[in-house]
Amino acid sequence: MYNLHREKIFMSYNQNKQYLEDNPEIQEKIELYGLNLLNEVISDNEEEIRADYNEANFLHPFWMNYPPLDRGKMPKGDQIPWIEVGEKAVGSKLTRLVSQREDITVREIGLPTGPDERYLLTSPTIYSLTNGFTDSIMMFVDIKSVGPRDSDYDLVLSPNQVSGNGDWAQLEGGIQNNQQTIQGPRSSQIFLPTIPPLYILSDGTIAPVVHLFIKPIYAMRSLTKGDTGQSLYKIKLASVPNGLGLFCNPGYAFDSAYKFLFRPGKDDRTKSLLQKRVRVDLRVLDKIGPRVMTIDMDK
């Protein structure tokens, strides 16, 4: 099956990748579309999202003796890992809510690697925004839950949460991304993004990748209200540019105007290149354009 549609996909991929690289405004429009879409869906469903997120606290007797393992460094012990609460009560929920929009069709395309939520989104709005280039995007949505002791302006991204330049030179070879040198204030790191900038489906659908990150931020009520539990405080949304925008045209990752957009991650040197993460600074990201949004959920 690997080679059944390979040649036509190869031809279409290179032709359409070049078109996107030559016309970066198309990618920027669909990235803003994806960001605004999630913002609207969250705003329209605030009550449901907040209620289901906070329900985890009322269910305390059911998990208190077998809590999730803390993956942080030197935890104080008074903070419960809330990662999966955000993934289910926000991430999975948003996929369902997006699919219910009148002008949107969602397909859960089989991909063996990628972010928490990944699906093909088709809409006539995309067709209009891209001047008929495509009506579809590959939505890559990751949930990054944080509490009051975590940074709310950092995103820590794995290689499979970032797309690269996406060269496909030989039919048999498949797509390869260039390694990138990430320079931070005090150190540097080699980073290898592992996601292509676009997908071509077997039916000919052109699907540029749109990377969106949802950052549910919870409050530890023991610190703020003299209470117990961890309640949803706010949600940050971020749109990280596609690999073509980052590393090709306009090349945000290399532009001094966005210095330290990427910084070395928190993995030690023993980690494989395919596992080493990188940090994105949301304060720098927001300088590129309307790339970061915040929704107050503490109501």
UniProtKB/Swiss-Prot annotation:
Keywords: Endonuclease, Hydrolase, Magnesium, Metal-binding, Nuclease, Restriction system. Mg(2+) 1 binds at residues 116, 142-143. Binds 2 magnesium ions per subunit. Its EC number is 3.1.21.4. It catalyses: Endonucleolytic cleavage of DNA to give specific double-stranded fragments with terminal 5'-phosphates. GO terms for biological process: DNA restriction-modification system. The keyword Metal-binding applies. InterPro entries: Restrct_endonuc-II-like, Restrct_endonuc_II_BglI, Restrct_endonuc_II_BglI_sf. Mg(2+) 2 binds at residue 116. Its cofactor is Mg(2+). GO terms for molecular function: metal ion binding; type II site-specific deoxyribonuclease activity. Gene3D superfamilies: Restriction endonuclease BglI. It is an enzyme of class 3 (hydrolase). Homodimer. This is Type II restriction enzyme BglI. It comes from Bacillus subtilis.
